[in-house]
Amino acid sequence: MLTLDTLNTMLAVSEEGMVEEMILALLASPQLVIFFEKFPRLKNAVTADLPRWREALRSRLKDAHVPPELTEEVMCYQQSQLLSTPQFIVQLPQILALLHRLHSPYAAQAKQLTESNSTFTPALHTLFLQRWRLSLVVQATTLNQQLLEEEREQLLSDVQERMTLSGQLEPTLAENDNAAGRLWDMSAGQLKRGDYQLIVKYGEFLAAQPELMQLAEQLGRSREAKSVPKKDAPMETFRTLVREPATVPEQVDGIQQGDDILRLLPPELATLGITELEYEFYRRLVEKQLLTYRLHGEAWREKVTERPVVHQDVDEQPRGPFIVCVDTSGSMGGFNEQCAKAFCLALMRVALADNRRCFIMLFSTDVVRYELSGPEGIEQAIRFLSQRFRGGTDIASCFRAIIERMQGREWFDADAVVISDFIAQRLPDDVVSKVGELQRLHQHRFHAVAMSAHGKPGIMRIFDHIWRFDTGMRSRLLRRWRR
């Protein structure tokens, strides 16, 4: 069967202009205009999706099939182009009958052309074919536009669903343009309103706990860049201003001994006029012991020195993935559970903004894994937030899972974050030893987010940093009072 792409090629119909016109009409639709005004960060993300839209539309036009009636008419037109005028005159009745049977838009005009001219000349033959071709071009263009209109409606429907989802989650997850772009990519999944409302709910809880959000940002961005001396660094000229006494006097600031005749004190000059003291005067002149005025001035000069440049390289501390382990034991239920989930959502926000990965593991009696920064990050986040914290505590399994994950090449610079109240059994010696090896040899950092003030020091001693967020009633009231 004839494809639309082949028909466009045969009739020299360009679909590019129609595709561009359709996309411009889509971008100018009131829904998108209002959305871009409300969420300017997502405008760049949607605009970046335009090449994919164009490719999808071209693919749809390329794979579409032409209706059988139009295919038959096109085949007849192609065969008619090969006929001479006498041969065409012989075939004309069959051609007219075919056009009538196919309900071709050109049927009436073709019949009028033959009936209004008693003699079918070569010029009339050429005119007949030209108008027939024009009719086919109009039909092909109409077919392209119909398909594009169907695709536009479908695309607009999909975009509206994604806009609704992205608009709801943008305040919670989109910190910058990079995060907005990743959020838009994640919104391509099939989600219902009731699903992502769970993220909105925890986003509102996080907004009501600004200290928790601040803690997540401090943890997520705790690595700072540092300058590192570079070997065989080139020499660089440094110019500094140095203050020193000037040779040109400016003011009298005391008396000194010297041999400056022009600055002698009057009593010294008086001794020169006394014959008995003249030799004494010359002796003191030679020994530079004459009393003279001390005149001082100040001057600045430029001092030029060379030294090696010691801060050539800037070693940015790597911002690698997050491997977050969340304690789902019974003691972490209630408000602790809300805080732990909201904290993971805040880390997801940091990961999206900094183009990092965020991997969640729940530990109780077994380990459940979620990746919140992948293409299906929103679905994974919803599944994570739907979990209930009612298990036991097996923190050793959590650390073993972290250690196993860090063996992979893509996790070589990962940061481990353990969220718990740390009311658990002591860690086995082999786990403590392996964690110390990762910290010492591979510079992995282990963070503890303590939800209780009663965590066991023996467990928490293993961490590089301990971030405390006491969820006790007294601490909650104090935080609320400070706000």
From Swiss-Prot:
Homodimer. Interacts with RavA. It comes from Salmonella heidelberg (strain SL476). Belongs to the ViaA family. CDD domains: VWA_YIEM_type. The keyword Chaperone applies. It comes from the Bacteria. The gene is viaA. Component of the RavA-ViaA chaperone complex, which may act on the membrane to optimize the function of some of the respiratory chains. ViaA stimulates the ATPase activity of RavA. PANTHER family: PROTEIN VIAA. Keywords: Chaperone, Cytoplasm. The lineage of its organism: Bacteria, Pseudomonadati, Pseudomonadota, Gammaproteobacteria, Enterobacterales. HAMAP family: ViaA (MF_01626). InterPro entries: Uncharacterised_CoxE, Uncharacterised_ViaA, VWF_A, vWFA_dom_sf. GO terms for cellular component: cytosol. It is found in: Cytoplasm. Its main location: cytoplasm. SMART domains: VWA. This is Regulatory protein ViaA. Signal peptide: none annotated. It holds the Pfam family VWA_CoxE.
